[in-house]
A protein has these predicted regions:
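Glycine-/small-residue-enriched transmembrane alpha-helix faces in small-molecule transporters
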Residues: 2-63, 156, 166-197, 215-216
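Juxtamembrane helix-entry segments on the extracytoplasmic side of multipass membrane proteins
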Residues: 29-33, 57-66, 85-90, 163-186, ...
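Specific transmembrane alpha-helical segments of multi-pass solute transporters/efflux pumps
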Residues: 43-50, 77-124, 160, 245-263
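Hydrophobic/aromatic residues within transmembrane alpha-helices
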Residues: 54, 64, 110, 137-143, ...
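Specific alpha-helical transmembrane segments that line the substrate/conduction pathway
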Residues: 63-74, 99, 108-142, 184, ...
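Helix-helix packing/entry segments at the starts of transmembrane helices
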Residues: 67, 104, 119-126, 194-215, ...
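Transmembrane alpha-helical segments that form core, pore/gating elements
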Residues: 73-76, 130-137, 151, 167-226, ...
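Hydrophobic transmembrane alpha-helices of multi-pass small-molecule transport proteins
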Residues: 76, 95, 143-165, 217, ...
Length: 319
């Protein structure tokens, strides 16, 4: 009976010759990964504001998801059919379940109940938290001191925002929106870890998510789900269609998959927690959403933890 070699038993991030273990490629790939993560931060900061605007306007959460996948699939489906082998469809179905439908529906439903500042904290601050938890549960990896401190800071910020949401007398239903945001974060964290393990490539990951999500979701939406999209103005349709379908579904998802492959799921997810500060300032300027003292402190703490984690020293195996 033959035994599997140690290399075969290792995950992609632990194999010799990968980005994590090649000193010659580490610095260049790290900068590329950080740059890609920075693009995602900008895209998702706008995503929080644009999605909140749509969810409190003429669109249901189901309308938002339909626009996201109708537009993205129009661009991506031909490449999916051409480039993805049928034997790999189950793997891409799983990626679409977590990085596509699960994330989008949880997030859009949350935007209908809670402000975009909460999304910035619970989604983008929650992703590194869930990523670390899932890594600990599935691999037992030990975290560096800086990563542990950054997670503590992120968690502290989440607790501050949670306290405000749960006990706010004017909007008692915000807690449900926050729970939905945390579910969206968990879904995206699973997606990031699967991308890191399976290494589908950024383009294949994007077209796979868009194509499969559209094929599954759009018939259900047209036949059974509540919709108010018919009453929306053309300008609102264009804004949501372009941002949700191109910027969020294609550009941001592709850059995140690229960043995950270059710097690991842990560091890429940490960078995303920088979104709250950008989202809060944008929401204040564009949506007139106030930032309370407690929320402001929580946003600062989460962002500090994200920055510390994203730029923590790399160990031999990036995860």
């Amino acid at each position: 009976m033959t035994r599997a070699s140690p290399a075969a038993a290792q995950t992609p991030e632990h194999r010799p010759g990968t980005v994590a273990d090649d000193p010659a490629a580490t610095a260049a790939d790290a900068w590329k990964g950080v740059a890609a993560a920075a693009v995602v931060v900008l895209c998702w900061s706008g995503f929080n504001i644009v999605s909140r605007f749509g969810s409190t306007g003429a669109f249901t959460p189901f309308d938002m998801a339909a626009l996201r996948y109708a537009v993205s699939a129009t661009l991506a489906l031909p490449f999916f059919i051409r480039d993805i082998p049928v034997a790999q469809y189950p793997r891409y179905f799983t990626l679409a379940l977590f990085g596509g439908l699960g994330y989008a529906l949880f997030a859009y439903s949350g935007f209908a109940l809670a402000p975009s500042t909460h999304a910035g904290v619970f989604v983008n601050g929650g992703i590194p938290f869930w990523t670390a938890v899932l890594l600990a549960l599935t691999t037992g990896l030990q975290r560096s001191r800086k990563i542990v401190v950054s997670l503590l800071l992120t968690t502290t910020g989440l607790v501050l925002i949670t306290a405000e949401s749960l006990f706010a007398p004017l909007e008692p239903g915000q807690w449900l929106g926050d729970v939905l945001f945390l579910c969206a974060a968990a879904s995206w964290a699973i997606f990031g870890l699967l991308v890191r393990r399976w290494q589908p490539g950024a383009r294949n990951a994007v077209v796979g998510i868009a194509g499969i999500s559209a094929v599954i979701y759009l018939p259900i939406y047209v036949l059974w789900l509540p919709k108010t999209i018919q009453s929306a103005e053309w300008g609102d349709l264009a804004l949501q269609g372009i941002y949700q379908g191109i910027v969020a579904a294609l550009l941001a998802a592709g850059m995140y998959a690229y960043a995950t492959a270059r710097i690991g799921a842990s560091r890429a997810s940490m960078a995303l927690a920088l979104v709250p500060a950008v989202s809060a300032v944008g929401a204040y300027a564009l949506l007139d959403e106030p930032i309370s003292l407690l929320a402001g402190v929580g946003i600062v703490v989460v962002s500090a933890g994200a920055g510390l984690g994203a730029w923590a020293p790399r160990r031999k195996a990036a995860v």
